[in-house]
Amino acid sequence: ITGIDYDEEINTVVVRTKLKTNYEEKLKKKTLTSGCAQGTIFGDIMEEFEKIKLSKTAKIKASWLIKLLKEINTTPSLYLKARAIHGCVLCKKDKAQVYMEDVGRHNAVDKIAGYMYKKSIKPNDKIFYTTGRLTSEMIIKTVKMRIPILISRNGFTSWGVELAKKSNLTLIGR
């Protein structure tokens, strides 16, 4: 560390180091996302995403989908009570395995990712359900988790669909 500065006016701490960064290179590859907040992702995330191709052999039966949706929509949850939070469910075939909820849809997705990582769960035969819209960010997160099927009770953005096609992710939504 070569220096630390605090700017009270904008409530920011700046830490300087001798380490080199590729920040300027990342800024050149900046991409606006299709989520509600018009977030920003940087090129290295997209470069990593574009290398991932999910298996085209992932299948979901209509009977599994009907059973899953019935189970998810009748299992007691904060989402069903309040409707003011987001829920995500990790499924295998026609069975829900793990429910996670949060006020932020990204956080609910991240909880599933963390759970899978901690429990060393293999994603290739899993189905991912979310109450949130299927924006580009949700597609990227699901693909990075290597889950081949993503379901939502909501719709998707055009860029989300485009990214899903590029990675072989199966989308099911309104």
Residue ranges and their predicted role:
Residues I1-G87, K92, V98:
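Intrinsically disordered, low-complexity regions enriched in acidic/Ser/Thr/Pro/Gln residues
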Residues R16-L19, G39, L68, K93, ...:
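Fold-independent oxyanion-binding glycine-rich loops
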Residues T57, H86-V89, K93, R133, ...:
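Short, surface-exposed, charged/polar-biased interaction segments
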Residues T75-I121, I127:
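Histidine/lysine/aspartate-rich catalytic loop segments that bind and position anionic ligands
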Residues R105-R174:
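Feature captures the catalytic cores and cofactor-binding loops of soluble hydro-lyases/lyases
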